[in-house]
């Protein structure tokens, strides 16, 4: 699943009526730009046969594919979720958070499930397409979540300038890193590259704690093979869980 999100523009201060009118215009513009970005993405992914999730009619009423996706992300069950106007409920299992694991209560369809979340502590020097394919060979159920929030040109340049100044002040001898930063600055300034904040987590599921610990160890080993240092979330377990859901960027503990 791939989700596009758009952060609405901040409303300007002013009289109540003018603010409401500006909000309405802004919503229309944001929706138009989101639709345009969606069309562009669907066209770019056309060889893979993507389709836009929506609602569908059944003899039992109207059902929502977006809500089914969120429910699948929540508890790993891909099931029909009815859509009712003014209601967007898709959760029927209680989630509890412990020291380094979470628990989804059982229900009539599924038994109790345990889960743990790993986040990226350190990235490899270089990345490439297909680098995460080795995770597909890990024999455990998992949810891999990634997000990328684009950064405007000036904030990106400002961050790189700050890092370069700190390196010079500390007399850092990492010459190759300094060269890469200078090259990256040039690419961003010339519009050849964009920068942003990347978020990457892996949630593993298991029936008991022993199986869960084994799954975490196997995933960490697979990450180490590709140069990624993964850390099992403890204090940030709950925000890491909610950060998997689209639009919850404010919960991301590591990016």
State each model region's role.
Residues 1-255:
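Extended, folded cores of ATP/NTP-driven motor/assembly subunits in large transport
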